[in-house]
């Protein structure tokens, strides 16, 4: 398995890109309301990224993906395509995933939004999924393994009677959008790649209310839960530092 270790200077540049990606998600907060379409949110994000941040939206054209954002509502696990036909409704939960390129470096992050008044069981899934993300992040340090990260996420999810999506994972990142290693959100302690200083990757657990099984819709992108139940996801990009880790996708 080949992957690139980043220098401290590289990581500082990735942090700038990561901060800009986080700022996109923060900016969108006021617009994620009942009645808005995901297509409108995509237009707002594109304008903000290109005109205000002076960055490149990494998703457009990536493997043929047509939009700036991934907008994944309710039972959509990931890769939902924004469109003017999809209107957010009161009670929806939605993940918005964005990646920007700044000075050649990628910043990749996502978060959940609650649309209007959300049922308690949906809010709990969103909250526990965020806890799962940080359970995984907290394992990141030199000498730990990717299995430690996956185990921490899986243990917390399953303790809460949720399931971890198996078919999609985190990934190495830098000047390339997706590189080694693959970061699974399940696993066994002590197994898998040993972490070392300079590794940078995303942790982005997708946690389902029902079973972990998924299917891809006819558009070739949108991934949904096979049983139609809710799914949630949160994502950060992290760097392995000399004594632990640093989150690279924190906003201002």
Task: Describe the residue ranges of each PLM region.
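Active-site neighborhoods and metal-handling regions in enzymes and metal-associated proteins
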Residues: 1-252
